[in-house]
Curated annotation (Swiss-Prot):
GO biological process: cell division; cell wall organization; peptidoglycan biosynthetic process; regulation of cell shape; UDP-N-acetylgalactosamine biosynthetic process
Coiled coil regions, renumbered to chain: none
Enzymatic reactions: phosphoenolpyruvate + UDP-N-acetyl-alpha-D-glucosamine = UDP-N-acetyl-3-O-(1-carboxyvinyl)-alpha-D-glucosamine + phosphate
Keywords: Cell cycle, Cell division, Cell shape, Cell wall biogenesis/degradation, Cytoplasm, Peptidoglycan synthesis, Pyruvate, Transferase
Pathway stated in the Swiss-Prot or TrEMBL entry: Cell wall biogenesis; peptidoglycan biosynthesis
Subcellular location: Cytoplasm
Gene: murA
GO MF annotation terms: UDP-N-acetylglucosamine 1-carboxyvinyltransferase activity
Binding residue positions for phosphoenolpyruvate: 22-23
GO CC annotation, single: cytoplasm
Oxidoreductase found in the keyword field: no
Protein name from the UniProt record: UDP-N-acetylglucosamine 1-carboxyvinyltransferase
Native source organism of the sequence: Rickettsia canadensis (strain McKiel)
Length: 419
């Protein structure tokens, strides 16, 4: 099994180009079911993208992949969809597989989707997905680990209030509503940039969506959607991770190809710690200026601080001057990186959904193991900060969400290699 070997202590200097957003491209790929053909550009080279390609092909889609140096183009032809079951063998690998449920159901009136897998960071139930589809007239049962869904005729527009903000359920509801009969009003929706990107793609396809980027979305269903070409936005989580890498290594890095406003909440937190963050053309520059203050942090739905950056930010706080409190409000069990950071000398105490982080002067290299995607990269950041050797095991998580990570870090001076 592959592992990463990191020799830390080298400040990162240079520039890093950000790839397409994983959490945007996956629902956009699922949206191809709603039309006959969809051309997607700026597609990141990730195993989750390969998994979604495999899932769509299992439904009968024909996919042409055009490879460029830093991205893929996908041309997805879905005219011959003939299988409406998403099997466990594929779905277990990735939670985003649940996003074929809404498109299959709204276009073909039936879908059978295995309960999903992905990172082991809590229950992340599908109850809200099922509830909103039932409100649109779907008949749904869960049998043998599968969601069996059907409808008599088209789904019907509805008014639905999400009990809590759910990115995944918001996406499935939008994907179903764009071809439903009548008007759908969704309340307490996710506002994430990736949801906005999906909506922009659907609007380009001919969907009628009002309220994009707000918590209240109105969708007037169409009979059909059009073939289009669409460029996926850049990945704010990847950008934020490299911003934190620059800070933890006491470096100076330009993060290129990202809109500042979608990473502003992280930028403001970094400024609060004493890190210099400067907006530049098409990106942001992060500069360590000799101090790192402890700050408190709470994860919340967008525009709050992203849960997908919590582990990386915690790595930074392990080296801060003082004590920080990190509160995880999105997922339970998302502190699985803490024992591994403590193996490296971090002083962290977990109490429920809160972690108390007491800054130490330096972390020490160690053999550590990744438990999920974001935890794995937090351990890389920790390893980069040390003056010794760190070995990271179970790195297959990384390839689900970070394209060319070792190359991008090495180009900025990191000593990191995969063996």
């Amino acid at each position: 099994m592959q592992k990463l070997i990191i020799y830390g202590g080298k400040p990162l200097r240079g520039s890093i180009n950000i790839s397409g957003a994983k959490n945007a491209v996956l629902p956009i790929m699922a949206a191809s079911i709603l039309t006959d053909k969809l051309h997607i550009t700026n597609v990141p080279k990730l195993t989750d993208v390969s998994t979604m390609k495999g899932l769509l092909r299992s439904h009968g889609a024909d996919i042409e992949t055009i490879e460029h140096q830093d991205e893929f183009e996908l041309i997805i032809n879905t005219r011959n969809i003939n299988n409406f079951t998403a099997d466990y063998d594929i779905v277990r690998k990735m939670r985003a597989s649940i996003w074929v449920l809404g498109p299959l159901l709204t276009k073909y009136g039936k879908a059978k989707v295995s309960l999903p897998g992905g990172c082991a960071i809590g229950a992340r139930q599908v109850d809200l997905h099922i509830a909103v589809l039932k409100a649109m007239g779907a008949m749904i049962e869960i049998e043998g680990g599968y969601i069996n869904a059907s409808s008599k005729g088209r789904l019907k527009g509805t008014h639905f209030i999400f009990d809590k903000v759910s990115v995944g359920a918001t996406i499935n509801a939008i994907l179903a509503a764009v071809l439903a009969e009548g008007e759908t009003l969704l309340f307490n929706c996710g506002r994430e940039p990736e949801i906005v990107d999906l909506c922009n793609c659907l609007i380009k396809m001919g969907a009628d969506i009002i309220g994009v980027g707000t918590s209240e979305i109105t969708i007037k269903g169409k009979d059909a959607l059009n073939k289009v070409s669409y460029k996926v936005l850049s990945d704010r989580i990847e950008a934020g991770t490299y911003m934190l890498a620059a800070a933890i290594t006491k470096g100076d890095v330009k993060i290129c190809g990202i809109d500042y406003h979608i990473i502003e909440n992280l930028a403001l937190k970094l400024i609060e710690t004493g890190i210099k963050v400067v907006p530049i053309d098409n990106g942001v520059q992060v500069i360590y200026e000799g101090k790192l203050n402890a700050v408190n942090l709470e994860t919340n739905p967008y525009p709050g601080f992203a849960t997908d950056l919590q582990a990386q930010f915690m790595s930074l706080m392990t080296l801060s001057s003082g004590v920080s409190m990190i509160t995880e409000n999105i997922f339970e069990n998302r502190f699985m990186h803490v024992p591994e950071l403590c193996r490296m000398g971090a002083d962290i105490l977990v109490r429920g959904n809160k972690a108390i982080v007491r800054g130490v002067e330096m972390l020490k290299g160690a053999e550590v193991m990744a438990s999920d995607l974001r935890a794995s990269v937090s351990l890389i950041l920790a390893g980069l900060s040390t003056n010794s050797k760190t070995v990271l095991h179970r790195i297959y998580h990384l390839d689900r969400g970070f394209q060319d990570l070792e190359k991008k870090l090495s180009n900025c001076g990191a000593d990191i290699k995969r063996v």
